[in-house]
Amino acid sequence: MGARASVLSGGKLDAWEKIRLKPGGKKRYRLKHLVWASRELERFALNPSLLETTEGCKKIIGQLQSSLQTGSEELKSLYNAVVVLYYVHQRIDVRDTKEALDKLQEEQDKSQQKEQQKAADKEVSQNYPIVQNIQGQMVHQALSPRTLNAWVKVIEEKAFSPEVIPMFSALSEGATPQDLNTMLNTVGGHQAAMQMLKDTINEEAAEWDRLHPVHAGPIPPGQMREPRGSDIAGTTSTLQEQITWMTGNPPVPVGEIYKRWIILGLNKIVRMYSPVSILDIKQGPKEPFRDYVDRFFKTLRAEQATQEVKNWMTETLLVQNSNPDCKTILKALGPGATLEEMMTACQGVGGPGHKARILAEAMSKATSTAIMMQKSNFKGQKRIVKCFNCGKEGHIARNCRAPRKKGCWKCGKEGHQMKDCTERQANFFRENLAFQQGEARKFSSEQTRANSPASRELRVRRGDNPLPEAGAERRGTGSSLSFPQITLWQRPLVAIRVGGQLREALLDTGADDTVLEDINLPGKWKPKMIGGIGGFIKVRQYDQIPIEICGQKAIGTVLVGPTPVNIIGRNLLTQLGCTLNFPISPIETVPVKLKPGMDGPRVKQWPLTEEKIKALTEICTEMEKEGKISKIGPENPYNTPVFAIKKKDSTKWRKLVDFRELNKRTQDFWEVQLGIPHPAGLKKKKSVTVLDVGDAYFSVPLDKEFRKYTAFTIPSINNETPGIRYQYNVLPQGWKGSPAIFQCSMTKILEPFRAKNPEIVIYQYMDDLYVGSDLEIGQHRTKIEELREHLLKWGFTTPDKKHQKEPPFLWMGYELHPDKWTVQPIQLPEKSSWTVNDIQKLVGKLNWASQIYPGIRIKHLCRLLRGAKALTDVVPLTAEAELELAENREIIKEPVHGVYYDPSKDLIAEIQKQGHDQWTYQIYQEPYKNLKTGKYAKRKSAHTNDVKQLTEVVQKIATESIVIWGKIPKFRLPIQKETWEIWWTEYWQATWIPEWEFVNTPPLVKLWYQLETEPIAGAETFYVDGAANRETKLGKAGYVTDRGRQKVVPLTETTNQKTELQAIHLALQDSGSEVNIVTDSQYALGIIQAQPDKSESELVNQIIEQLIQKEKVYLSWVPAHKGIGGNEQVDKLVSSGIRKVLFLDGIDKAQEEHEKYHNNWRAMASDFNLPPVVAKEIVANCDKCQLKGEAMHGQVDCSPGIWQLDCTHLEGKIILVAVHVASGYIEAEVIPAETGQETAYFILKLAGRWPVKIIHTDNGSNFTSTVVKAACWWAGIQQEFGVPYNPQSQGVVESMNKELKKIIGQIRDQAEHLKTAVQMAVFIHNFKRKGGIGGYSAGERIIDIIATDIQTKELQKQITKIQNFRVYFRDSRDPVWKGPAKLLWKGEGAVVIQDNNEIKVVPRRKAKIIRDYGKQMAGDDCVAGRQDED
């Protein structure tokens, strides 16, 4: 025995003897337990010496654990002792057996997780596109449709928010460039974003080529060539090459490199789409910390910063920008806290948890005598124990010193002890805490829903009386009793009368007995013990007590004792006929808000006719009975107009509410379903049923807080009484939130049914349900009934009228048969005259039919609808439209069917060219069995060619296929590989086509001509040009050749652009089979270089015909008016008599410059030495310059370092304008978004060019942002803000905005993009307009002012030079500039001047100092009196 006792050495034995057998018990482990354990081990055939080590104990635990479930009490005790010993060996402190067992459980769970993790790591992820086959070769498996579909969904749902980048990164794990291109192509519809991405890829590819020059000489045999930039982008490399690079030794990870480039581009796109700075992310006062952290990291991912900077942001900004409550907690945690610790510490601060805690505290006060801790969740808290024997707190009956009470401690009866007592416990305190009204709850699963407190009511009724209508009122007395209705938003407390005494009690359907506190009742009582939440309480039982509850009387047993709250249990509630009722669908409401800063609609009700008022009154009375709408009082200030229309083919009326105003003010919703399901994507099913949900919207409750905004009024005839006011309790028809909320609720409701029946396919679109399965029809129908039951439980009816059990099924406008589908029969109307509305409907029907009838065309029918016509206008059919309609009628006569999708077979798409820019296509798996067909007739640009259109068709089909089937079909295209290659090499960045093969179905797609890339030796060179006069619309076009030929033709009703094209046409007509053409028109060059083969312009079509006939054509561009030989000659030829010539030398140059820059008369007079009258005549003759100049008044600070900034809007874009106040010089730029980031960047650029001391802006959010403040601080710029709502404080920049817009208007047609026009206008304003002080242009003036400022700063040193400066100044209240005066002295804040022998001191901000160059001022000695005359 001694040997066995030596299991533990001295120190460990002490620890062993401190451990308690039970939590809170007195007994502890002793030496005897070790001796007993070693003996027991021998009984179980285990070696007792195992007890001496940690490892040994672990082995014993492993052996015993498996037998625990079936083992005896001794075995369990042995196991417990060994577990405690295991921890003593490891010198880990445990206080009692339970803690040791808990620790072991935790340890085992952790090791199990690690095992699972290891196992998971061993399995290869399916997303790695390059895998090794059995032969050991590296092969490529294409990205799965699921991956592509996930990517498309990400872009559709998130647009380009920051999450897109990690999602892209995860989905493209290990992908090859070809896979990455597939991913990009599936979202090719986002053209602006893709263009940005393309630019980034091209830049990166060029940079790669620069850093990795090609090695000279041939590549040694067996060695791979090195990838170029375009190889990495997957455009000039094959899939095999990509795999070889990626798996070679050493590898070139082309996939990863390309992915990095794409992520760079995505970063740019994200910055454009969600320009939020991390500095702007602050936690709201009531925002849960977890939500704030999510927003913070979402923005952090989009920030352009190194990882170190991001780490710093996380450490400092996260805490700094949290709200005060969380900040206090986080600071207490100290700087080293992990994110997990922060989240745990701040859990529930400010969120709904606050309310829960307050409720819990209130509850604990009410039930402080009756708390029982659950298991050991609250370690360390002492529970209050109460003695059953004497009733005192602080000890239990076993340790009670008072004499033992006779009988049972539970029921008080003699003859048995408590452990043998059979008396039932009274579950008296089973009150569910309902959340406060309007608090968002988690959507519980349907099992828990059955007893959730969401929207139930307690009704009290007697006997089997039918329930009267909700809300009915008591009328009269006696038997016409109406029963109260009690909602469960608050605890159902009611006033009761017991034996004549008034009390308040809780109606508790979960308690068996009725228990009251502190009430004296007559008659005999029996002692009784009942079990409550906090243990047992002693009560007195009174029988046959009359109780009155809510006017209903009952007689029953009442228990009286120390209950924390008076309870009416089921023994009385059942007598009263009290029921739990679920009214309108128990679906939880979706919280809805108005747009920030907006209030509800207040639109007056318009007058209605008597019959409409009657109809509406009837409809609303019915709806009110059904609980769909409720009457409201005058306290609701909102209103939406309501009217009535007759239902189609019936005498019944229908109520319509005009929710347009409310829709404008309601928050935006995410469109839950992006399109409608298509039958071609359905898999073939044995049994099918189609259901329709009745009164769909009216089954879903509307958010309680939002209901007030749906108020409407039914007026009375002749206003004899005030209108009746109602508001909606359910989703209204016509409100913009209804579809999204309905679909969201429907999806949640179907979720448990779908999970329970995975073999059943349910397609849900709004209220149409398609249910398919491979079950036998009997079983299938049973499932359908289960589904209908399930929907009914949630308040959705599925009317038998619209329940389709037998094929053909009519669903979503389609007709479904067991093995094929078609569109529902289409009738094309026969009419002698067609209105716009008729043709719109006809085109709609044909469009719908085109998904299954191949060859339908509608181009000429659509042409009839061009221009703004009224719906009722009669439109004559053109001959082409008649023919098109007749062809379509023939096609539709023969019914055509589509088949269903078979996932085991490949998809094939075949495309045909129909001519006239129309294309048709079929998608099938077996020949002649089409899944679906379609047509394409979009023209994305005015001048296009077939190859470009073909790629557009392919991309449309690819996107459509991913949506319907989740994968891309193989394409069969009517184009030869060579033709495609030729075109594609030029345009690879813009397009990508998936796997395809050539199919010879005429007409084939071909490139009709090709332009040479180098001049053609020996061919004649034609210099072409054209000119037109804007007013007379007369023009000339012509050419001059290097062989001395020339030709000019006069044109009428033309424009500059047309004459340029006409000149090219002339050159092509008059030249041989090979020709070089030189033009100075970017416009003409741009059109022809894209190799169009058709155009909306007749002239371009004629040029195309000429180009097709030539063998070789080279087209090149030179800048105009730069004295280039042939170009200058032809320019003179076509200009004579067209561009206006006045009667003086130098005028033509001035006029030409004016046509380009619209400079003012002063600039022309000075630059071309023209008399003012002639210069003014040029301006007067320009139709774009006949706008009045605007005078500037008001007193503005004119110090040299001050700039005013403002944003203005034009063509839907934002222009940021900066004006140098003293000179009127402008800097302006089109910015992508009105954000602090863009503004700060602009300010830094400005500060890098000019000395900026002060910027003066309005209070726009971009100017007041922290980013701008930081930029100003860094550049040492002082920021001043204007007076809110007083545009005058921004006067200079405001008037410059107008001026700039005026100039842009004059030259807008010279530039394609607004950003170009803005820079042209800035140039014109700064250098081509003269006037104002000194007769300078703004550009000359700013340089003069800055130079002068530098010189005058040296004034004190060189006081003698001061006489050379002149000062223009303003007096205090007079806005007119005076001067010039002599400068005597310049200080920091003021200048001293001499004006007509009078010496004055003028504040620095009211003076402009200019060097006197002895130049003649425009005007006499005072310029300022004249405003600019431009």
UniProtKB/Swiss-Prot annotation:
Keywords: Activation of host caspases by virus, AIDS, Aspartyl protease, Capsid protein, DNA integration, DNA recombination, DNA-binding, DNA-directed DNA polymerase, Endonuclease, Eukaryotic host gene expression shutoff by virus, Eukaryotic host translation shutoff by virus, Host cell membrane, Host cytoplasm, Host endosome, Host gene expression shutoff by virus, Host membrane, Host nucleus, Host-virus interaction, Hydrolase, Lipid-binding, Lipoprotein, Magnesium, Membrane, Metal-binding, Modulation of host cell apoptosis by virus, Multifunctional enzyme, Myristate, Nuclease, Nucleotidyltransferase, Phosphoprotein, Protease, Repeat, RNA-binding, RNA-directed DNA polymerase, Transferase, Viral genome integration, Viral nucleoprotein, Viral penetration into host nucleus, Viral release from host cell, Virion, Virion maturation, Virus entry into host cell, Zinc, Zinc-finger. The record marks W983, W996 as: Essential for RT p66/p51 heterodimerization. Its EC number is 3.4.23.16, 2.7.7.49, 2.7.7.7, 3.1.26.13. Residues 73-77 are annotated as: Interaction with membrane phosphatidylinositol 4,5-bisphosphate. Zn(2+) binds at H1154, H1158, C1182, C1185. Coiled coil: none annotated. Mg(2+) 2 binds at D1025, E1060, D1080, D1131. Residues 809-817 are annotated as: RT 'primer grip'. Protease: The viral protease is inhibited by many synthetic protease inhibitors (PIs), such as amprenavir, atazanavir, indinavir, loprinavir, nelfinavir, ritonavir and saquinavir. Use of protease inhibitors in tritherapy regimens permit more ambitious therapeutic strategies. Reverse transcriptase/ribonuclease H: RT can be inhibited either by nucleoside RT inhibitors (NRTIs) or by non nucleoside RT inhibitors (NNRTIs). One of its GO terms (molecular function) is DNA binding. A motif (Nuclear export signal) lies at residues 16-22. It catalyses: Specific for a P1 residue that is hydrophobic, and P1' variable, but often Pro; Endohydrolysis of RNA in RNA/DNA hybrids. Three different cleavage modes: 1. sequence-specific internal cleavage of RNA. Human immunodeficiency virus type 1 and Moloney murine leukemia virus enzymes prefer to cleave the RNA strand one nucleotide away from the RNA-DNA junction. 2. RNA 5'-end directed cleavage 13-19 nucleotides from the RNA end. 3. DNA 3'-end directed cleavage 15-20 nucleotides away from the primer terminus; 3'-end directed exonucleolytic cleavage of viral RNA-DNA hybrid; DNA(n) + a 2'-deoxyribonucleoside 5'-triphosphate = DNA(n+1) + diphosphate. The active site is at D508 (for protease activity). A motif (Nuclear localization signal) lies at residues 26-32. Residues 445-454 have a biased composition (Polar residues). InterPro entries: Aspartic_peptidase_AS, DNA/RNA_pol_sf, Gag_p24_C, Integrase-like_N, Integrase_C_dom_sf_retrovir, Integrase_C_retrovir, Integrase_cat-core, Integrase_Zn-bd_dom_N. A lipid is attached at G2 (N-myristoyl glycine). HIV-1 lineages are divided in three main groups, M (for Major), O (for Outlier), and N (for New, or Non-M, Non-O). The vast majority of strains found worldwide belong to the group M. Group O seems to be endemic to and largely confined to Cameroon and neighboring countries in West Central Africa, where these viruses represent a small minority of HIV-1 strains. The group N is represented by a limited number of isolates from Cameroonian persons. The group M is further subdivided in 9 clades or subtypes (A to D, F to H, J and K). This is Gag-Pol polyprotein. It comes from Human immunodeficiency virus type 1 group M subtype F2 (isolate MP255).
